[in-house]
Amino acid sequence: MNSSTNATKRWWYIMPIVFITYSLAYLDRANFSFASAAGITEDLGITKGISSLLGALFFLGYFFFQIPGAIYAERRSVRKLIFICLILWGGCASLTGIVHNIPALAAIRFILGVVEAAVMPAMLIYISNWFTKSERSRANTFLILGNPVTVLWMSVVSGYLIQAFGWREMFIIEGVPAVIWAFCWWVLVKDKPSQVSWLAESEKAALQEQLDREQQGIKAVRNYGEAFRSRNVILLCADRK
């Protein structure tokens, strides 16, 4: 197997998919700030206190469901999890455009936090299934770049939609791409290298062998107590740089 060719195939096939998926998640998470400037607070009677509550509800869902999402992605399927999340967060984003009261908006923001909580850990697990230890730093960097790049084009698109139509239409329109992309994701993505047809059998075997070799000697962490007693975790927490 030519490892360089193998890495190139994986890089050009997988990373654009990862980048687009994470960008869409950030889009549906961050466009509320544009709506706030465009009049959603006045239209729905959102006070400063309610605005703080809405933000807290989003991150409450995000906080409590990130670990369960990561566990499902690791033990079951990143492909299935992200497919469901894409449909739900796109639907929640579009539903935000038709709400007329604060309780409905609060429920949507909480659900949006829940379904988006799994995105980052699931993407990291997906990358670890496809890239070796020496390749993951670059792959993870490309994933994180989805945030600032999305801000650049989202500012232009959201500003145009608000100017041309209004904040309601902005939410409805910007939620649609996530739903459409869910079906693209389902067709394009497989959880493991062994499941794809665009790698040769020898390439799959060599990649899986290297990934398995890297996992040897790594002790599984079964609970939070073990995690906090880990030497690496203690050193990380003690690092004040």
State what each model feature region is.
Residues 30, 59-67, 117, 151-152:
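Residue-level signature of mid-helix packing/kink "hotspots" within the transmembrane helices
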Residues 33-65:
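Extracellular/periplasmic helix-loop-helix junction of adjacent transmembrane segments
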Residues 45, 77, 98-104, 115, ...:
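Helix-breaking motifs and short loop linkers at transmembrane-helix boundaries and internal kinks
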Residues 64-103:
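Conserved MFS/SLC helix-loop-helix module at the cytosolic interface between two early adjacent transmembrane helices
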Residues 101-109, 235-236:
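Short hydrophobic/alpha-helical segments at membrane-entry points of transmembrane helices
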Residues 108-146:
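Cytoplasmic helix-loop-helix junction between adjacent transmembrane helices
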Residues 143-196:
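Helix-loop-helix hairpin linking two adjacent transmembrane segments in secondary transporters
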